[in-house]
């Protein structure tokens, strides 16, 4: 019995029980080792003309014996001598593959891709096996050698027999464990089934470059006997057939010109379990200091659980065609969590078990490039296939808005131009850039209204007032919309016609254009303004003068109305935004009525101490109702002022989609007027 060199049983226990968290990856590791062995022989044949090799014969074979409780992984690769068995398997964490890569670094070409690097993958076999036997015959040698160990104390190496070069790794599986206190137990029998092994091969090693073969059970109809009568019923028989389980060449490593869209669609649907074709397919290859392939998909519709806390984002991460992580969330920002796909790179730094990644600059560089590619593709869809983009935005636009809101506006530069909102003027979805291009020359802000439906917003007096002045209003109907705009604060519109400070500068520019010069453009910072909040600064000088005069003349009326309404409003004032309606509710400060409603819709309602919107009751001084208020004030009719104040406030709330605090009293007041 030979002892494991330099490392103790404690270290082996660490390898088996601590490094790996998922026992089923033992098959991935052993198949990767077999692939490396075949790669080494393939490389040797390229360097040494005397090595005669038929590429079509190179393969890996997996088999099992349920009665003997064994799984065998065989390859016809380069094999190992007794010395190599001693060095590679007798010394824990010694990687023959890493040594091979180092020794042949300058000679290796694109035809060899060694997977192993740490020298511990082989020992994952002891997670499921009570005994491991390795039979190996090195290429060019006449004698095979057998390495055996139970993973406890040491190992033996003896002479053996094998018909040709290559290696057999034979695992004797552990017995099933007994139920623990939680009623759980590891059942190793699951690895002793055809379906169990096939599914593991296809999950983790589907794109290993060599055929992974298994004898599989099939059924076929027996030949019909020549003397069979009319009442003959077909008979069937079971048989075994050698079948290649893996796909070998991954679709993301094929040249784009060699793959049809239908092939991408089928790969997407089968891999990511979707019934619909993807809306977009993004395939690219990166070279340089960091080399990788990426194949990304934008789904045609949102997964049912996309916005639930249980949804997991991430791309499948492969290293040298071997699956490392099914969902690597570090490769996608949260606002692109809907993207599905694959990244394959041999350059990312893995941890020793290859189950997870080490935090490294390579991964961040890949993620940054992936993000840019997704953004560019979405921009292309927005500009060249608007119908498809609007459908995409209907499915996934909420996430883009959350990307801006959750980053406190830091991601606005990347995402703002991907957003779409309904234009009250154009009656269609438009981008912020399109809104800016359609503005009158004197417009200095982007106007919006927030609520639960476009139909209701379009009828709001404050919206109509802005539209009547010739300015468009964006109608925001998702709960995150206004929070997103508040996080952005402004939108920088690029290549806008330059605004000149004085007539002389403007006239000089106009003359230059007339003489053939290009019109001057500038980036314009446009504030995002809620039409129901604050001063929109849209009134003309004459309108401002009229409002000031009306305010001064009716200070006593406004004071009486404020007293009647109490702390429901901050103040009562003359409106500069109304044209037809008698009154409206606006707000001062950062919290609008709509934002207050959204916060109150939370699972526990409005939290204690949550600030409320600072409401203002604005009156249209040109409306007949205002004249009645003035008359009541002059007559000293405080009861009527109180009644009218309550009615105007409650009807303004109804227009905003908010029920009066006392609907019964409101109905009674309306009936009394009738």
Residues covered by each model-derived region:
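GHKL (Bergerat-fold) ATPase N-terminal catalytic module, capturing the glycine-rich phosphate-binding loop
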Residues: 1-187, 191, 199, 222
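GHKL/Bergerat-fold ATPase module in large chromosome/replication-associated machines
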Residues: 114, 132-154, 174-179, 183-674
């Amino acid at each position: 019995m030979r002892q494991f060199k330099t490392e103790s049983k404690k270290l082996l226990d660490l390898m088996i029980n601590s490094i790996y968290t998922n026992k089923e990856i033992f098959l991935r590791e052993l198949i990767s080792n077999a692939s490396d062995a075949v790669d080494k022989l393939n490389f040797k044949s390229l360097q040494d003309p005397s090595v005669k090799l038929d590429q079509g014969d190179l393969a890996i074979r997996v088999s099992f014996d349920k009665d003997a409780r064994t799984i065998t992984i065989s390859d016809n690769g380069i094999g190992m001598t007794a010395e190599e068995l001693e060095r590679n398997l007798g010394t824990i964490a010694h990687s023959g593959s890493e040594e091979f890569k180092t020794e042949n670094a300058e000679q290796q070409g694109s035809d060899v891709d060694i997977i192993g690097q740490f020298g511990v993958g082989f020992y994952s076999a002891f997670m499921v096996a009570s005994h491991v036997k390795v039979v190996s015959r090195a290429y060019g040698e006449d004698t095979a050698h057998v390495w055996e160990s139970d993973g406890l104390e040491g190992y033996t190496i003896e002479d053996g027999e094998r018909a040709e070069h290559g290696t057999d790794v034979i695992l004797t599986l552990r017995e099933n464990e007994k139920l623990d206190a939680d009623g759980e137990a590891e059942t190793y029998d699951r690895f002793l089934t055809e379906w169990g092994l096939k599914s593991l091969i296809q999950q983790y090693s589907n794109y290993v470059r060599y055929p992974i073969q298994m004898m599989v059970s099939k059924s076929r109809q027996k030949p019909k006997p020549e003397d069979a009568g009319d009442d003959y019923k077909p008979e069937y028989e079971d048989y075994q057939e050698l079948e290649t389980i893996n796909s070998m060449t991954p679709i993301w490593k094929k040249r784009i010109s060699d793959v049809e869209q239908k092939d991408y669609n089928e790969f997407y649907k089968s891999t990511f379990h979707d019934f619909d074709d993807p809306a977009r397919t993004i395939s690219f290859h990166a070279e340089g200091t960091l080399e990788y392939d990426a194949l990304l998909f934008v789904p045609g519709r949102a997964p049912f659980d996309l916005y639930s806390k249980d949804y997991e984002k991430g791309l499948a991460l492969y290293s040298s065609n071997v699956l490392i992580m099914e969902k690597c969330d570090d490769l996608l920002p949260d606002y692109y969590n809907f993207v599905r796909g694959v990244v394959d790179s041999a350059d990312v730094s893995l941890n020793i078990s290859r189950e997870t990644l080490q935090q490294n600059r390579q991964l961040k560089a890949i993620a940054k490039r992936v993000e840019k590619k997704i953004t560019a593709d979405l921009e292309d869809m927005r500009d060249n296939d608007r119908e498809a983009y609007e459908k995409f935005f209907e499915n996934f636009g909420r996430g883009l808005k959350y990307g801006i809101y959750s980053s406190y506006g830091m991601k606005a530069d990347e995402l703002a131009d991907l957003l779409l909102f309904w234009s009250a003027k154009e009656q269609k979805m438009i981008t912020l850039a399109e809104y800016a291009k359609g503005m009158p020359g004197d417009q200095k802000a982007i106007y919006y209204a927030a609520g639960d439906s476009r139909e209701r917003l379009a009828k709001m007096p404050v919206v109509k007032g802005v539209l009547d002045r010739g300015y468009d209003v964006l109608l925001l109907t998702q709960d995150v919309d206004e929070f997103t705009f508040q996080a952005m604060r402004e939108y920088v519109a690029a290549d806008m016609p330059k605004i000149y400070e004085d007539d002389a500068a403007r006239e000089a520019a106009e003359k230059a254009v007339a003489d053939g010069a290009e019109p001057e453009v500038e980036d314009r910072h446009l504030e995002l303004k809620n039409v129901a909040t604050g001063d929109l600064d849209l009134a003309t000088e004459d309108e401002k003068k009229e409002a000031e005069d009306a305010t001064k003349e009716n200070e006593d009326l406004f004071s009486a109305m404020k007293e009647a309404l109490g702390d429901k409003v901050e103040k009562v004032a003359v409106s500069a935004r109304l044209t037809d309606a008698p009154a409206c509710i606006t707000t001062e400060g950062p919290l609008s009525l709509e934002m207050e409603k959204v916060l109150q819709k939370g699972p526990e309602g409005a939290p204690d101490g949550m600030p409320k919107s600072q409401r203002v009751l604005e009156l249209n001084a040109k409306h007949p109702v205002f004249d009645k208020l003035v008359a009541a004030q002059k007559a000293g009719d405080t009861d009527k002022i109180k009644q009218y104040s309550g009615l105007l406030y409650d009807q303004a709330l109804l227009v905003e989609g908010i029920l009066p605090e006392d609907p019964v009293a409101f109905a009674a007041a309306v009936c009394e007027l009738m």
